[in-house]
Regions:
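Flexible, glycine/small-residue-enriched loop-and-beta-strand segment within the central core
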Residues: 39, 66-76, 81-150, 170, ...
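Active-site/ligand-binding-proximal alpha/beta "capping" segment
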Residues: 149, 163-164
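Short secondary-structure boundary/capping segments
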Residues: 4-5, 52, 122, 129, ...
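Terminal amphipathic alpha-helical/low-complexity segments used for targeting or macromolecular assembly
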Residues: 1-59, 177-180
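Rossmann-like dinucleotide/phosphate-binding beta-alpha-beta segment
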Residues: 159
Length: 185
């Protein structure tokens, strides 16, 4: 089994593998191009976003400072907004629903590393997909960890670290993020 096959099967894989690294190199180049586009050139931004990401359902606005691992594993819905300095480490798929907003300096990461030092010395990682529903607002300086599913109509308060699934119609905050209250539909 190749390292790429291990990655896609959700198993531990070596992140220095050539095939895995090549995906990242392509994304780094495309992110650099996207971030260099003039902020008022919406047509060119739209073209670059659609070239970088796996799928874009409708309009998407991504501010400068956007970075991702692969790009093609990110699938976004209608009217997507990412503020400044958003990073999505999409070694595994990231699905983001319609009408979602991501605040500045936020990290969405599908990849983690072993707790065992011996595994980290071998450059091992494991990727788990992330799913984000419709009408989600992720505040600034948040972290969404691997394998998390976020429901519809959810607000993630600024600075939260989301380690577990979040049900529909919920406001969460804190480190780790905990339910504060239910939201009206």
């Amino acid at each position: 089994m190749t390292e790429l096959q291990k990655l896609e099967a959700g198993l531990e894989y070596c992140f220095f593998d050539e095939e895995v690294a090549q995906r990242k190199t392509n994304a780094v180049i495309k992110c650099k191009q996207l971030n260099a586009i003039a902020p008022d050139d919406f047509k060119e931004q739209s073209r670059a976003i659609k070239d970088l990401l796996g799928s874009v359902k409708g309009e998407a606005y991504i501010n400068a400072g956007f970075y991702c691992d692969c790009g093609k594993n990110i699938h976004i819905g209608r009217d997507f907004v990412a503020n400044f300095n958003v990073t999505i480490l999409d070694i595994a798929p990231v699905h983001i629903g319609d009408y979602c907003m991501i605040g500045p300096n936020t990290l969405i990461t599908t990849v983690g590393h072993p707790l065992r030092a011996s595994g980290r010395r071998k450059h091992l990682a494991q990727a788990k997909p992330i799913n984000i529903g419709d009408d989600v607002w992720i505040g600034g300086n948040c972290v969404i960890l691997p394998g998390v599913n976020i429901g519809n109509n959810v607000v993630i308060a600024a600075g939260a670290v989301v380690t577990k699934d979040v049900p529909d119609n919920t406001l969460v905050a804190g480190i780790p993020a905990k339910k504060i209250r239910e939201l009206e539909e």
